[in-house]
Each structure stands twice: as structure tokens, then as C-alpha cells.
Amino acid sequence: MPYKISRAAYAGMFGPTTGDKVRLADTELFIEIEKDFTTYGEEVKFGGGKVIRDGMGQSQVTRADGAVDTVITNAVIVDHSGIYKADIGLKNGRIAAIGKAGNPDMQPGVNIIVGPGTEAIAGEGKIVTAGGMDSHIHFIAPQQIEEALMSGMTCMLGGGTGPAHGTLATTCTPGPWHIARMIEAADAFPMNLAFAGKGNASLPGALTEMVLAGATSLKLHEDWGTTPGAIDCCLSVADDYDVQVMIHTDTLNESGFVEDTIGAIKGRTIHAFHTEGAGGGHAPDIIKICGQPNVIPSSTNPTRPYTVNTIAEHLDMLMVCHHLSPSIPEDIAFAESRIRKETIAAEDILHDIGAFSIISSDSQAMGRVGEVAIRTWQTADKMKRQRGRLKEENGDNDNFRVRRYIAKYTINPAIAHGLSHEIGSVETGKRADLVLWNPAFFGVKPDMVLLGGSIAAAPMGDPNASIPTPQPVHYRPMFASYGKSLTNSSVTFVSQASLDAGLKGRLGVAKELVAVKNTRGGISKASMIHNDLTPEIEVDPETYDVRANGELLTCEPATVLPMAQRYFLF
């Protein structure tokens, strides 16, 4: 007769199982385990007196015959595809299998073979997510990369050359020479990186040479002149070479209004940055563009979520970022035209209903590179408190809302930028760029960050201590952040055209160069998982009130947020 164990005792030993609920950090978001792939009584666990021992949960199978390199045991997987419990097998830097690990010689249902060559990572009581992707990076300082990695990001896409004034304001790496230098620099960093060229030109020649130099995308920014002619030219080049276009539209409406921009886009796929408008764009109604079926709308994190401090901090932030002077009245008017509490409040709700698809940072250029995950989950929590459960929920949990929000910084930016064949989800065959979290610290402070199946970062105590836990415990780079392990554990994404033109041999970089694909007509707003709603948006030009399909979108600013000061006392 099988031995019976209480749910509490089981969760304490192997982690929660089907039907158990887990609170995410100090939010009001609760997930419920939908399925457990284990066989009860046959769970594998590492440690003294535990299961993964020779002749027990560990087989005699060699790596060549199918044993995995690493097994993550009994983890709760939180992904756009579902919330479930499983073992995860990693091999050759990729996710080899998800399911039941163990010794097939003596255990039933094993699809992940543990052998003498297998390392074990204890996932009991932990959450595993795909590494995050931040698709709005100003490469102002290389130190951003470590900050992002330690927050759970494993891919950064954007533009820049360092603290040049063009980079301080715009996410562009202009020209083939600068793109080459940035791709060369990428070899130094434990992070998957991708670079955007400048998209502002009325003739295609200069844009084409940037794509051939390795740009994965082209960025149209108003500070370089986002005119209808530049928009049309840039999208035409992107269509020719299968790269994405990101757009920051004309705040001052000098060369046209939002309707003119929509007309210049001509129904082609485009990623609209900070679509609410505080980060820049046609004032006051750029937010209308999120209802277009060809536009993939995103947010940058300073407006996430709307709080009592949002408006005040944005004015000073904007003056610095866009090289404006507080002594020039026109500059002050420019800044004030972009900061509107009505559209920021509406942005909260548009995220919650799935009309905004992506959340990113806008690093050091009106955005915080280490807070993409935090701001995403703070928005989700605020919306649950203010709007209640989503109608799509099934059962007494927040699973659908959690799946909607995690998609905003994992799978959806990966789809938008042609990287989803490699990253963006916990899925067999994809890169093993994974993040482990203690549920109490979910979204705030990771337990471990893996890049290409190797540990790149983790909190670690005093290296001279007798055990790993004594203070001071802080985030430190791990072995995948050093030497050839670094360049073998992460990649640099480039255009297919640049690979065809011999970029790898020309630059002689150590990292693998991987081509983006399917960024144009094969994707649209409908491709944004759990975030594909296209409501008709209206903005009152006098009051800035926002309506979606006739319904007024408004909410109160938050006065208190979770995942905030209590997590950062030290």
C-alpha cells in the first residue's frame, strides 16, 4: 500500500504539486500548479540520503548514450504556455527535455536520463522562468549589462555607442563602423546581445549598409527626424532584409500627426516604443496606435505602474535625457506635453486587457535596466487590486494574468524581433537561458541565472567562508561569465544578410552569431501571445481622456507598491 504524506510535508520535501498555490513575492498574485509531471513516489532529489545516487535515481548511462548535462529537479515552471511542475533536462546549452527525470533502468516514465555526468540543480520550492528579454536598450554604459543579468534578463536589444549624446537620447548604433565595434565588444559580456542601427534616412543606401554590418533592427527616433519619408524608407529596407523597425514618433507633430504616421507605415509590421507617449511620440494621442493590427505596442518601465510619484519624476528625467534646458520655455513646454496622467493611467489598463504587448526598460534614458521584471509584476498587482480577477481566469488563481504579464518580457519581444526560435520560453529545443526564483523574491531577486545551460550569476556569500551562505551575500558573476565559457554560453544576434556577407570572418569575434528571422509580414499584433487585443482608441485632445471601444480607461495612482522598499533594505 502506498505511503500517504500531507500536502504540507510533500511541498516541504519536493515543492508544491498539482492544486497547490504559490504567492508571488509580496503581491496579491497567486498561481496554482496546473499539472505535475512527476510520478508520485519516484521523484528525484539530490542530497545526502536522497534519490540521485548511483544505482538509485542516477543511472549508468553515458552522455553519449543520452544522459543530460544538467537536471533541474521538481521546479515550478511559470511560462506563457502554462504553470506546471516538472524536471528540466539541459544538454549542449539547450533545453533537452521537460518532464520526469531519473534512472530509466528502475524508474517508470523517465524522459530525462540522469547519469554520472549529470549535474543537479535543486528546483524544489523554486520557480523557473525563461530569461527575460529587454528590447529597449540604450547602450550608454557597459555596466548596465551586469545590472540586467542580475535582475533576470538574459537578452538585451537596442542601440548605442556609450555615453555619446546621440546614445543618451536614442537607441541607435549609427553606421557600419560603430556596429562593428559594438559586436566586437559583445564578446566581453555574459549576455545575449543584439544591436539596432539608425533608421532615420530618406534614401535606403545608408540603412542597407547598417543591416549588412549586422544590425538586427532599425530604430526611427524623433531626435533624428521621424518624418513620413524616413518611416517609409526604413520599413522598405526592413522588408527587403527581414529586420524589425522600432519607432519613436514626432512628439511636436512637426512633420505630421499620428494619422500621418499610420499612413506612412502602410500596414507594415512595426514595434512602437513607449506607445503611451511619456517616453516620446505624437502628443497627446500616440496611444491610439495600439489599436492598429500591424503595430506591436510596448511600454518602458518608468510609467509602470501609474503611481503618485510618476508625473513628478518624469519631468526632470525627460529634461536630462533629451538635452533640454529648464531656462528655455519651449523646452519646458516640450517636456510637459509628453507627461499626461490620463494616458499613463490608461496604459495600466491597456496592459491588463492585453492591448499593450511588451514591457522594456529604456535603460538610463528614461528607464531602469534592472527593473523590467519588477515593474511588470507591480503593474499586474496594481491591476488585480483595482480591477479584480480577469474574466479569462479558470479557478481561484491568477494564472492567466501571470501568463499574460510574463509574456510581456519573454516570448513577445522575442517574437517581435525574430528571436523566438532561440529564446523567450521554457521550451524543448530552445537555449537554456533560465532563471530560478525563490517565490518570496519572485521578480525581484533571482536565485540563479543560467546562460546557455551554465550558471552566469547568483547571490553568493563570503568566498572565504566555510560555506556559501555567510554575509556579505550579494550578486556575483559565476563561471559562465568568464573566459571561453562566456563566449560559448551567450550569442550575438545579427541579420541574416550580414552573415551571408561574411560578417563572422570579417570581425573574427568569438561568440556565435545567430540570425534573426520572421520579423516582417509573418508577424503582427496577432502574434503577441495573450497580448493581441486591438481596441479602437480615442483620446480627447482637451482633457487627454482615453477611451477603448467607447469605454473610459482610468484608474487611481498607486500610493504603495509591492516588490519595493522591503526588498532593498540592504
UniProtKB/Swiss-Prot annotation:
Its main location: cytoplasm. Heterotrimer of UreA (gamma), UreB (beta) and UreC (alpha) subunits. Three heterotrimers associate to form the active enzyme. This is Urease subunit alpha. Ni(2+) 1 binds at H136, H138, K219, D362. Its cofactor is Ni cation. Binds 2 nickel ions per subunit. It comes from Rhizobium etli (strain ATCC 51251 / DSM 11541 / JCM 21823 / NBRC 15573 / CFN 42). It comes from the Bacteria.
